[in-house]
């Protein structure tokens, strides 16, 4: 702290603390929006695959087929 009185030094220190807190909060909010945007983009790509996105494997029986039981239910639980 240079050249000021006690009051000025306290204000300068409080300003630095406030600046660090604001920068930290902005970084946190930025990371939150970044994650939210990436998640939303991935969901939209999977939901609307015909519009240039990817696809969820196994999301449609016509595309990926579906599970067919190989045993009768009674034989699964028989002792």
From Swiss-Prot:
Sequence positions that bind a bacteriochlorophyll c: 25
Keyword field: Bacteriochlorophyll, Chlorophyll, Chlorosome, Chromophore, Electron transport, Magnesium, Metal-binding, Photosynthesis, Transport
Entry's localization field: Chlorosome, Chlorosome envelope
BP-aspect Gene Ontology terms: photosynthesis
Molecular function GO labels: bacteriochlorophyll binding; metal ion binding
Gene Ontology cellular component terms for the protein in this record: chlorosome envelope
Gene3D superfamilies in alphabetical order: bacteriochlorophyll c-binding protein
Described function: Component of the photosynthetic apparatus. The light harvesting B740 complex binds bacteriochlorophyll c.
Family: Belongs to the BChl C/E-binding protein family.
Protein name per its UniProtKB record: Bacteriochlorophyll c-binding protein
Organism: Chlorobaculum tepidum (strain ATCC 49652 / DSM 12025 / NBRC 103806 / TLS) (Chlorobium tepidum)
Gene: csmA
